[in-house]
Amino acid sequence: VGDWSSLAEGARAVRFEVFVQEQQIPLALEQDSADADALHVLIRNRQHLPMATGRLLQASPGVGQIGRLAVRRERRGGGLGKVALKALMAAAAQRGDREVMLHAQTSAQSFYTAQGF
């Protein structure tokens, strides 16, 4: 978990592949200024290649918002999404957030429900 300046390169690579290339979300919608102020998680494989990412925004005082959670297709189903989500939840708790909201696609609802949301 870290800031955008330290994790941007890897996070951008995963998000571009998942959101822009795979899901056809326009790059202009995927990228926003909120990244600069968010906490980010980046999970790399043994070869140090980025495999999963997500971010935690401060929605309001004491309220975090998790979003942009993405796992490369070849690593889905292996638990990386769960690891990334838990890392962001831990960062929210450490920051003192009393509540955490999700900003996610409805197609991922079953994943988040299985994680307690």
Residue ranges and their predicted role:
Residues V1-H40, R44-L49:
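Short amphipathic alpha-helix that is part of the acyltransferase structural core
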Residues V18, A91, F111:
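Short alpha-helical functional segments enriched in proximate histidine and acidic residues
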Residues L42, L49-Q58, G62-A70:
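Conserved beta-strand in the GNAT
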Residues P50, V71-R72, L80, V100:
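Structured catalytic cores of enzymes that bind and process phosphorylated ligands/cofactors
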Residues V71, G77-A90:
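Conserved acetyl-CoA-binding loop-helix of GNAT-fold acetyltransferases
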